[in-house]
């Protein structure tokens, strides 16, 4: 999310928006982030953490795919704004809130401190790399290719979460520990 907010004015300008409008649109996107973050705080205990991450990542996948397509066909700046707002909404109620709750609940007590440290460090490293790579990706892949790559990242998130991350809503530490430590049959 760090790289997204850092480059919003440039994203909107490259979609054909005037500079003054690009900054206003950046503020509008930040308000969307606030509203959907507050919504997620209310929803996270009702819908479940995994459900929110999957729904949010799915919305991000579609939004990135379509932003890339609109850049590819030189579509309207308004469409890009709406799709960026959709991405931000998906991030806010998925990875922006539910991901942090999962990180705090998923590890057994014995490894919780180390596991959380590694997960949070990984999140910050990805944010840093996004900040560093975004301009290079735009230069070498174009805006369309850049957003298609991000859409691929969202798809990988969906697959990873769907197959490997358990739902932690309503589960005790003992249940989560048992999930990770019990013998499971190998699947073929």
Each model region followed by its residue ranges:
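Alpha-helical transmembrane bundle of multi-pass membrane proteins
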Residues: 1-188
